[in-house]
């Protein structure tokens, strides 16, 4: 192992270096103190009274922003604390009445104002129960929906409509003719009339009895006859058809015919005039 021994006393060179270092240290401190900016003493703010009100307002605003002076807070009076907000409905009614007033001489304006205020108050009182009823209605509906009790009750006060009946049927098909309709529907009953709409390929067949029309609709609707699919329905407009072969009508006409002879009871009182052949020549 190697031991190094440092003497307690400094040599001359070390003393010179130490003195030099102390001088440099003092110079450095003096240079830093010279370069550092000097702090100027704060000057007291001298408030000058501005000549204009606008300038005073600007100065006060700047001072409040800088925090030099606090903002003045308005003290609430007892009347402000006990005041209440006017209802919206009353404000709306008051605005509408003020807009509708006419600038003219009104000798009874004070009484009219009292009446208007009374009407406004009565309207507000009427609106409150209506709002409560609406709220109750929506609340009950919501409860019923949550519980699953939404049931729509339909009360049919009207009587059930009677089934339609008639003698005339509506027939439509591709290239339908009058002869085709007579031939096809002749088996269901006596045909009174057949009317055609040739451009639209449809027609109307009138039977003597409604039963024949019902049977034709039941059997021929949607049926194909000679390659033509027929659409048979009851006609919307039913013409009034008087039955021809009715027993009562035939009896009436037979009695009238029996009472009257074919020649009649009138006697001809005229004399026959005869002409000769020479006169004709």
Swiss-Prot record:
Signal peptide: none
GO molecular function (one): RNA binding
Entry keyword Ligase: no
Residue stretches of biased makeup (Basic and acidic residues): 49-61, 88-97
Any GO BP annotation: negative regulation of transcription by RNA polymerase II
Segments for region (Disordered): 25-109
Role noted for this protein: Essential component of the NELF complex, a complex that negatively regulates the elongation of transcription by RNA polymerase II by RNA polymerase II. The NELF complex, which acts via an association with the DSIF complex, causes transcriptional pausing.
Protein name listed in UniProt: Negative elongation factor E
Record organism: Drosophila virilis (Fruit fly)
């Amino acid at each position: 192992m190697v031991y190094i021994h440092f003497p307690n006393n400094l040599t001359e060179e070390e003393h010179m270096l130490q003195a030099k270092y102390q001088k440099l240290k003092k110079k450095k401190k003096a240079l830093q103190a010279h370069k550092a900016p000097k702090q100027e003493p704060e000057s007291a703010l001298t408030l000058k009274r501005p000549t204009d009100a606008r300038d005073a307002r600007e100065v006060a605003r700047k001072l409040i922003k800088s925090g030099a002076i606090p903002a003045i807070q308005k003290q609430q009076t007892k009347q402000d604390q006990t005041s209440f907000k006017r209802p919206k409905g009353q404000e709306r009614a008051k605005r509408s009445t003020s807009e509708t007033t006419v600038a003219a001489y009104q000798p009874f304006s004070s009484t009219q104002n009292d009446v208007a205020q009374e009407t406004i108050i009565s309207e507000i009182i009427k609106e409150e129960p209506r709002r409560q009823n609406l709220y109750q209605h929506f609340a009950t509906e919501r409860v019923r929906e949550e519980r699953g009790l939404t049931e729509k009750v339909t009360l049919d006060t009207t009587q059930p409509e009677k089934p339609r009946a008639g003698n005339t049927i509506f027939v439509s098909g591709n290239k339908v003719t009058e002869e085709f309709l007579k031939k096809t529907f002749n088996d269901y009953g006596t045909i009174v009339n057949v009317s055609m709409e040739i451009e639209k390929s449809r027609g109307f067949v009138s039977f003597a009895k409604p039963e024949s029309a019902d049977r034709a609709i039941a059997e021929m609707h949607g049926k194909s006859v000679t390659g033509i699919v027929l659409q048979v329905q009851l006609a919307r407009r039913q013409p009034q058809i008087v039955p021809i072969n009715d027993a009562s009508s035939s009896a009436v006409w037979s009695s009238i015919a029996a009472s009257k002879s074919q020649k009649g009871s009138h006697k001809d009182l005229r004399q026959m005039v005869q002409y000769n052949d020479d006169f004709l020549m």
